[in-house]
Amino acid sequence: MISLFDMFKVGIGPSSSHTVGPMKAGKQFVDDLVEKGLLDSVTRVAVDVYGSLSLTGKGHHTDIAIIMGLAGNEPATVDIDSIPGFIRDVEERERLLLAQGRHEVDFPRDNGMRFHNGNLPLHENGMQIHAYNGDEVVYSKTYYSIGGGFIVDEEHFGQDAANEVSVPYPFKSATELLAYCNETGYSLSGLAMQNELALHSKKEIDEYFAHVWQTMQACIDRGMNTEGVLPGPLRVPRRASALRRMLVSSDKLSNDPMNVIDWVNMFALAVNEENAAGGRVVTAPTNGACGIVPAVLAYYDHFIESVSPDIYTRYFMAAGAIGALYKMNASISGAEVGCQGEVGVACSMAAAGLAELLGGSPEQVCVAAEIGMEHNLGLTCDPVAGQVQVPCIERNAIASVKAINAARMALRRTSAPRVSLDKVIETMYETGKDMNAKYRETSRGGLAIKVQCD
């Protein structure tokens, strides 16, 4: 059973699959070298990056992430401000300090990081890391970054975790989830909490989700108070700060009944602009879609009631349980199923979480989740210039408003839905697999080839 800790991971931008996952892979590789007693024998390290990781890797900072992982850093704790200087030193000296400075190796500028357009056999986001002693390979590993910051090595691809802990309500589908809720009388968030308590203590759960919400709030605060231009060739100006000033200073806006939409847009823009700048964010379930879940909870906090620990925990439990269904039965990787697996899933999760907070039954929560995905089916992932900026930032704002609408529609529905959550998850996955690779995070089609950099 997937822990909801894994659905909401603190990390750095701009991408969970192309930044967070590769950093974790680099860290895992160097940890293996230490554990196997090989670190001191290594004289050179080289990396091969494939598929979507290669095609959009520069714009997504994949190369930087792998280097920082090999240096011994983790996404949740890496010192973001230190990254540019560290990378500059590696490039200038063509040397890389591994495992928090324990051992230095060659990392040539020309072939230390090699980008390949083709895919490895098991997934669109593949990478290989090699450690050499002279010309001899002393250790090599193939990793796949499968979305949302999850990584798996080649040997364990498609396998269940060997140390998987049993939970009291091991649902694999929305149908099973609802059956457990009906049988026990638990709300959807309550049932998810019972499973989580089999994996973590109550204290660990409380502390973890307090940190998640604090990180989201800090990200919103930074984003709506920071001006300037986002990094990269597109020179995209930040918009959240100007929108915030407009909202707090205009009497005309304050009397507009649609004013709340502007606030929701601002919350989402703030988060995704921080993500695009490589800031500290929370996967929800990915970085490319990290603005939707916090924007909807910030909406609840500002316009319905102040968010308490009980409220944000219920929200994350319901949203996370829905996200886990997509992770188990479909994909949350834009490189595998397009943006419907990122923004679509985040919209579905946020709609479910909000429906839970608004008093929805488990059935209504699942209807909200279904609506949130149904109207994102077929959504392509075509980042312009390989950056997580256009259309990604604005798309998060649109989907945040859509999630609120989905929750409200679900709660006010008086007839039985014709489309189930399980069927929409199945449809999303099949649609993604049928989607031309041009539209799955390769920047080879759609807006990515129509919008030119200046």
From Swiss-Prot:
The keyword Iron belongs to this UniProt entry's keyword annotation: yes
Transferase among keywords: no
Enzyme Commission number(s) from the entry: 4.3.1.17
Keyword line: 4Fe-4S, Gluconeogenesis, Iron, Iron-sulfur, Lyase, Metal-binding
UniProt-recorded Gene Ontology molecular function terms: 4 iron, 4 sulfur cluster binding; L-serine ammonia-lyase activity; metal ion binding
InterPro entries with a match to the protein in the record: ASB_dom_sf, Fe-S_L-Ser, Fe-S_L-Ser_mono, Ser_deHydtase-like_asu, Ser_deHydtase_bsu
Modification after translation (UniProt): Activated by post-translational modification by a system involving at least three gene products. Activation is mimicked in vitro by iron and dithiothreitol. There is considerable evidence for a free-radical activation mechanism.
GO cellular component, one term: cytosol
Cofactor note: Binds 1 [4Fe-4S] cluster.
GO BP terms: gluconeogenesis; L-serine catabolic process
Family (UniProt): Belongs to the iron-sulfur dependent L-serine dehydratase family.
Function: Also deaminates threonine, particularly when it is present in high concentration.
Name by which UniProt lists this protein: L-serine dehydratase 1
Top-level taxonomy: Bacteria, Pseudomonadati, Pseudomonadota, Gammaproteobacteria, Enterobacterales
